[in-house]
Amino acid sequence: MDRPAVSGPMDLPIMHDSDRYELVKDIGSGNFGVARLMRDKQSNELVAVKYIERGEKIDENVKREIINHRSLRHPNIVRFKEVILTPTHLAIVMEYASGGELFERICNAGRFSEDEARFFFQQLISGVSYCHAMQVCHRDLKLENTLLDGSPAPRLKICDFGYSKSSVLHSQPKSTVGTPAYIAPEVLLKKEYDGKVADVWSCGVTLYVMLVGAYPFEDPEEPKNFRKTIHRILNVQYAIPDYVHISPECRHLISRIFVADPAKRISIPEIRNHEWFLKNLPADLMNDNTMTTQFDESDQPGQSIEEIMQIIAEATVPPAGTQNLNHYLTGSLDIDDDMEEDLESDLDDLDIDSSGEIVYAM
C-alpha cells in the first residue's frame, strides 16, 4: 500500500534566533510546503509547524483550512494554536501528535484486528461527528490525515483541513478533491454533493484499509490504474478477501457505507448507533458534550479571526526581493489524452477541471 510521492527542491523557511519557536527536526513535506517539529521556548512544549511559502500558495484553501481549523476544539482533532508570518513563509502552529500517522501504523502491522480497527474507527467517527456538528465537512479524510498521540492506547487526531468546507461560510462543495482511493462516487460526478455524506464514504475506506491492509477499490493486479479505480468506485466494486475474518456486523456496516446513492448511505448518527460501533465503546466517546469540555481556557486560540485574516492577507505578498523558483508537485493527477478519452467513454459524468486534472491532496 503506497502513498503518492512528492519530490523536488524546496525553499526552506527563514528563521531567526529571536523567534518564539526553535527547530527540533523536520517531520514532513508535501504539496503544501514543509512541516517541522518545534519547541516553544516559553513553555517548552513541542508543536508541529506547517510552513507555506508566501505569495501565490496562500490561496482560498489555505485560508479555509486555518479558519475552519481554528473553530474546532475536540480531543480527536489536532489542536490549532496560531499563525505566524515569517520573512519567507506563513507558519501554522498546531498540536504535535508524537505517535505519527495511522497510515504508518497499518503499514507496519499489515492490517489490524477487528477490535483494534474498531478502536480507531470509533475515535475517527467521534471527531468527524463533531466537525459536522460545527458545520465543517473535511472532504479529504484518509489515513495520512489521521495522526496518533504518543499514549499506550493511542488517541486518534484528525488533521489537515486544507480542503474542508464550512456550510456556514461556503456553498455546497462541487469541486473534485480528495485522494482518489477515498473519493465517494458522487464527488466524481458533475453535481453538487453533501460533503458530510461524502465524508462517511471516506471513513468507510479508512475502516476497510485498517481491516484488510489494502484499498477497497484498487485492482490488486493494477493498483496504479487510475481509470480502473474510478470505474470500481462508481460501480461500488469491492470485496473482502477470504483471509480476512470479520464479524457479520462489521460486514453489514461496511455494506451500508459503500452505497453509491448518497441518500441511501448510512449517516454518521446512524453509524454511532450501529451495533458494531457500540461494542466496547469507550465511555468518553459516548457523549460529545464530555469530549468538548476536556479543553480548558488555555486551549482557546489566542488570535482573533480578524488578526488571522490580516496575517493571511500579508502572507499573500511574496517576500521582498525574492521569487518563487521552485514548482514542486501539486498532488494532481495528469490525465493523458488516451486516458481522458477512455474516461469520457466509460464515465461520462466524471468531473475533470479546466486544467485537465482531477485534484487530490496528499
From Swiss-Prot:
Alphabetized Pfam families for the sequence: Pkinase
Phenotype of null mutants: Impaired ozone-triggered rapid transient decrease (RTD) in stomatal conductance. Impaired induction of MKKK18 activity after 90 minutes of abscisic acid (ABA) treatment. Delayed CO(2)-mediated and darkness-induced and reduced abscisic acid (ABA)-triggered stomatal closure.
GO MF assignments: ATP binding; calcium-dependent protein serine/threonine kinase activity; identical protein binding; kinase activity; protein kinase activity; protein phosphatase binding; protein serine kinase activity
Induction summary: In roots by ABA in an ABI1-dependent manner and by osmotic stress (e.g. sorbitol) in an ABI1-independent manner, but in leaves by low humidity (at protein level). Also induced by salt stress.
Active site: D140 (proton acceptor)
General function of this protein: Activator of the abscisic acid (ABA) signaling pathway that regulates numerous ABA responses, such as stomata closure in response to drought, darkness, high CO(2), plant pathogens, or decreases in atmospheric relative humidity (RH). Involved in the resistance to drought by avoiding water loss. Required for the stomata closure mediated by pathogen-associated molecular pattern (PAMPs) (e.g. flg22 and LPS) of pathogenic bacteria such as P.syringae pv. tomato (Pst) and E.coli O157:H7.
Effect of G33R: In ost1-2; loss of kinase activity, and insensitivity to ABA during the stomatal aperture regulation
Binding partners and assembly: Interacts with ABI1, PP2CA and SLAC1. Interacts with B'ALPHA, B'BETA, B'DELTA, PP2AA2, PP2AA3, PP2A1 and PP2A2. Associates with MAPKKK18 within the nucleus. Interacts with ABI2.
Domain called Protein kinase: residue spans: 21-277
Chain positions covered by the region annotation Domain I: 283-318
Name assigned to this protein: Serine/threonine-protein kinase SRK2E
Family: Belongs to the protein kinase superfamily. Ser/Thr protein kinase family.
InterPro entries: Kinase-like_dom_sf (IPR011009), Prot_kinase_dom (IPR000719), Protein_kinase_ATP_BS (IPR017441), Ser/Thr_kinase_AS (IPR008271)
Effect in UniProt of substituting T176A: Normal kinase activity, and normal regulation of the ABA signaling pathway
Gene Ontology BP, a term: cellular response to carbon dioxide
EC numbers on record: 2.7.11.1
Gene: SRK2E
Region (Domain II): 319-362
UniProt keyword terms in alphabetical order: Abscisic acid signaling pathway, ATP-binding, Kinase, Nucleotide-binding, Nucleus, Phosphoprotein, Plant defense, Serine/threonine-protein kinase, Transferase
Tissue specificity statement from the Swiss-Prot or TrEMBL entry: Expressed in seedlings, leaves, flowers, stems, and roots, but restricted to guard cells and vascular tissue.
Positions of the UniProt region annotated as Activation loop: 160-186
